[in-house]
Amino acid sequence: MNKQKRLRLFCLLTAILLLSVSSSSLAAEAPVQPKPTLTLIGHASVKIKTADGVVIYIDPYYPGDYSEEADIILVSHEHSDHNKVNLCKQKADCVVLRVSDTINKKDVTYNTFDVKGVAIQPVPAANKNHKIDSSTGFVLTFDGIKVYHAGDTSKLTQMADLQALSIDYALFPIDGKYNMNAAEAMACAVLAGARHNTPMHYFEADPAGFTPENLLLIPYGDTVELEKAAE
């Protein structure tokens, strides 16, 4: 091989090496997209954080960490174990939605909201202790994921409508005090048809009594990463 060919080969190999190093460096520096998370603080108190960092608290009450400033606070009804909004640190533009915002009492229709990329759809929640015009559940849509928080409720025929929404994560009260017990909650899980079913609002009740298909048991205080359904 003459000197000129060796020089060309050297230059080619050098270029390939530099390109490889540059590509590896770019791959290493590419930011990792955070995953959305859900924390079951306790009772019916839930914290959701979207991939973009939007912080949502639902039914704040149970002792826990509310220190991350809220973008959105949702109150399903005004019982004292669901409405402790003052526990949450709030951003200056925090949106607080209570029953007076979400339900039109005259005809029991529901107002929907889109806040910071989170679609908020109130849905029926009721039983003998919670009037249909004074209580809601919520379906939240963000990052291609749907989360259903049932609020305080018993089984309702309207829950069958949730199947059409393709719920990814559903949370059901199970203690049987002012709402349904675990057996009735399992029937609700069948109606809703979510990919994951989680018990909440169980006080001294044993969450092990809630055994639906697709059970996702989240101990109080724990956080899980939320995943989109496989396409």
Locations of regions flagged by a protein language model:
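Bacterial N-terminal signal peptides that target proteins for export
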Residues: N2-L12
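Bacterial N-terminal signal peptides
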Residues: C11-V21
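Cap/insert and terminal regions of metallo-dependent hydrolase folds
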Residues: S154-E231
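Structural motif
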Residues: L74, V147-H149, L171, T198
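A short helix->loop->beta-strand "cap" motif at the edges of active sites that frequently abuts
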Residues: V54, Q90-V96, G193-H196
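Di-metal (Zn2+ and/or Mg2+/Mn2+) metal-binding site signature of metallo-dependent hydrolases
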Residues: Y62-T102
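Sec/Tat signal peptide C-region and signal peptidase I cleavage site
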Residues: S23-A27
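Core dinuclear metal-dependent hydrolase active-site scaffold
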Residues: A28-E68, I72, D101-A164, M180, ...
